Amino acid sequence: AHARRLAAEGALVAVNDRVASPALDELAHEIGGLPVPADMADREAVFAGLDRASEHLGDVDIVVANHAYMSMSDFLDHDEDDWWRVIDTNLGGTFWLIQAALPSMRRRGAGRVVIISSEWGQVGWPRATAYSASKAGLISLTKTLGRELAREHIIVNAIAPGVTDTPQLQVDADAAGVTLAAMHEEYAATIPLGRIGVPEDIAAAVAFLADFRMEALVGQVVSVNGGSTRTRA
């Protein structure tokens, strides 16, 4: 949804997934963009991907760090490999992605970085220890880089989505032994807006934060969750 929204507003978009696939190629073709498969936990792959994007599309001036890896288990069941896979992908991958894109933004004299964190990075979530910690780290990265890069007109902000209607929700429903409709209803009951999010909600926020006419919002976290965090202590 983010890629389609930015392309519709005139951006040349490089789209990423961990591995090459027909679906990635089809999306890139649909929006007139470029498929750039790369494992975001691999620093060399991230830098190579940015080089490929720059070679084909020109200097990068907008980065949307939307990649994520999640696992859920009781705290004592998180093993070392699982912990580092989550941290290296979510937090490390974003760190490398911004490092790789920064020279392009400096050449252009401006840039926009939109980091996709999570509501769980703000409030935490049981059994999602590594994921929540990684997403909280992204919020700190946003605030720090926001302060560091703003004078160069490179503006860094984050989005913290709440529960959103993606394929992961079906996985969660199956794991809980309930129907998808029941899970929608359960989550919606806790959200002041009365519904869970949809990808287009997040895409609209991405487009806003990527807009070069908007510069005074720096190092902020935009909570796109229908007001759900306002219902918690």
Language-model features: where?
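Alpha-helical segment proximal to the catalytic Tyr-Lys
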Residues: 103, 147-151, 215
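Residue(s) in the substrate-gating loop at a strand-loop-helix junction
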Residues: 118
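Short C-terminal tail/terminal secondary-structure segment
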Residues: 123, 207, 218-233
